[in-house]
Curated annotation (Swiss-Prot):
One GO CC term, this protein: cytoplasm
EC numbers on record: 5.2.1.8
Signal peptide: none
Membrane-spanning segments: none
Keywords in alphabetical order: Cell cycle, Cell division, Chaperone, Cytoplasm, Isomerase, Rotamase
Membership in a protein family: Belongs to the FKBP-type PPIase family. Tig subfamily.
Comment, domains: Consists of 3 domains; the N-terminus binds the ribosome, the middle domain has PPIase activity, while the C-terminus has intrinsic chaperone activity on its own.
Keyword flag Cell cycle: yes
The protein's name: Trigger factor
UniProt catalytic activity: [protein]-peptidylproline (omega=180) = [protein]-peptidylproline (omega=0)
Biological process per Gene Ontology, one example term: cell division
InterPro entries named in the record: PPIase_dom_sf (IPR046357), PPIase_FKBP_dom (IPR001179), Trig_fac (IPR005215), Trigger_fac_C (IPR008880), Trigger_fac_C_sf (IPR037041), Trigger_fac_ribosome-bd_bac (IPR008881), Trigger_fac_ribosome-bd_sf (IPR036611), Trigger_fact/SurA_dom_sf (IPR027304)
């Protein structure tokens, strides 16, 4: 090996990291120092000297040897790092980290001597599936509830209802109460954050707001003021309020009720642009059944992906999860921007930190799943042909030609390729796995506890003893 050649030694580390131990020859150090001096000389302004004509010693005296060495050292490390990656044919996933720190290296740096540097970086993890074929999962198979059709119709009636004033009676369940209220904690007397409103339309339905709030308004008359002694649920969305007793001063300002339209052909034309009520019901039934079947399929796919991920043996680098978290936050910011919100003022450092913490578990799960699917593709040699991508790309021809914005074709092709491969991998999983379907009978889902800041939904499910097995394997033709 030439005396002035870079010496590179690599050592694998946990969590898919690699340590690079570099020995950088003195010739490289000298060259980078001289190049740094030349670069600074071209832009430095010193009275009595022309640009680019400042003597070396004068320049060093002016900027200081430490500053010069710091600039040169950055160049030395970057140049040697890029060369080391080429020598070892390694593609890093993250920026390199100096083990000893820059200040420590700078303190012992001398252009006349070789320099030893240790850098660490994340690399693509090695993937192994303990098992890919014959995965077995159990899912709860819920039967379609025909009552959901009537519920959908009733919801539609409520949407098209006429709102009429009520003046001659007290409030009852089903009414729309216009209320003002002010809440405070019973123990401290402190006002509740989000617990005050000057005027709010509140549908008087059980389990809306915190327990007892709606019930306390029932039987009130317009103009009445009432004190409600309530307690926040232990699982309330805001941690500071959980389990605390509260006092609400409520005033009933106005009262309205819904006048529901009759279920007839006229209603079908008004609500769904259908000629008859029969046709409307048929359309609603189709939509609900389609959604139901999609949900059932999604449940099965989720179970299969979880099972596959459990077979994955790998060490996921932190940088992959960090990138997924960052992408999730950026997507959230884009949605905010599309809604017309000011992203800069909304996404404070505190909010970004909170989002990063709350989305990290799901981000880690997403990365694990993607790696499991990648491992499956490699193990079973599942690929996407160029013809498949081209065929799918044709579906976007009109969108591309009519778009006012420049579309990144390369990125679009990559997204389409990844989506097609994922679809093919999921189909393969369905065909080569066993799904045990446990039939369940589901009762009505009840919406509960709609507060000013959060809504919770509780669903009760009763299991039956019947169990069915289905083998998701296609017959070979």
């Amino acid at each position: 090996m030439a005396k002035d050649a870079l010496i590179v030694k690599t050592t694998p580390l946990p969590q898919s990291r690699i340590s690079f131990e570099l020995e950088i020859p003195s010739e490289t150090c000298k060259t980078c120092v001289n190049e740094t001096i030349s670069t600074i000389s071209r832009s430095a302004k010193i009275p009595g000297f022309r640009l680019g004509k400042i003597p070396k010693q004068v320049l060093i005296q002016r900027i200081g040897i430490t500053q010069l060495h710091a600039s040169a050292l950055e160049k030395i490390i970057d140049k040697s790092w890029q060369e080391a990656l080429k020598i070892k044919s390694i593609e890093p996933l993250s920026e390199p980290e100096l083990v000893d720190g820059f200040e420590s290296l700078l303190a012992k740096f001398s252009p006349e001597k070789s320099l030893k540097v240790t850098l660490q970086t994340d690399v693509a993890p090695e993937l192994k599936l303990k098992k890919s074929k014959g995965l077995s999962v159990e899912i709860s198979k819920t039967k379609f509830d025909p009552k959901s059709i009537d519920e959908a119709l009733e919801k539609s009636r409520n949407q098209f209802a006429n709102i009429i004033p009520v003046t001659n009676r007290a409030a009852k369940l089903g009414d729309i109460a216009v209320v003002s209220f002010k809440g405070k904690y019973k123990d401290s007397g402190k006002e509740i954050d989000g617990g005050t409103s000057e005027s709010m339309d509140l549908e008087l339905e059980k389990n809306k707001m915190i327990p007892g709030f709606v019930e306390g308004i029932v039987k009130m008359k317009i103009g009445d003021t009432k004190t409600l002694n309530l307690k926040f649920p232990e699982d309330y969305s805001h941690e500071d309020s959980r389990g605390k007793e509260a006092i609400f001063e409520v005033n009933l300002k106005d009262l309205k009720e819904k006048e529901l339209p009759e279920l007839n052909d006229d209603f079908a034309k008004q609500s769904g642009n259908k000629e008859s009520l029969k046709e409307l019901k048929k359309d609603i039934e189709k939509q609900l059944k389609d959604n139901f079947e999609k949900t059932q399929k999604d449940i099965k796919i989720e179970a299969l992906l979880d099972a596959l991920t459990n077979e994955l043996v790998t060490e996921i680098p932190k940088s992959m999860i960090d990138l997924e978290v960052r992408n999730n936050i950026e997507q959230t910011a884009q949605r905010f921007a599309q809604q017309g919100l000011d992203v800069k003022s909304t996404f404070t450092p505190e909010l970004v930190k909170s989002l990063a913490e709350s989305t990290r578990p799901q981000a880690e799960k997403n990365v694990q799943r993607n790696l499991a699917l990648k491992a499956l593709a490699e193990k079973e040699n599942i690929t996407i042909d160029k013809s498949e991508i081209d065929l799918k790309m044709k579906e976007y021809d009109d969108v591309i030609s009519q778009s006012s914005k420049q579309i990144d074709i390369k990125k679009l092709t990559e997204v389409i390729s990844n989506d097609l491969l994922k679809e093919k991998l999921i189909i393969w999983l369905e065909e080569n796995s066993e799904v045990n379907e446990k039939t369940t009978k589901t009762s009505k889902a009840t919406k509960t506890s709609k507060t000013t800041k959060a809504t919770k939904t509780a669903t009760k499910t009763t299991k039956t003893t019947k169990t069915t097995k289905t083998q998701n394997k296609k017959e070979k033709k």
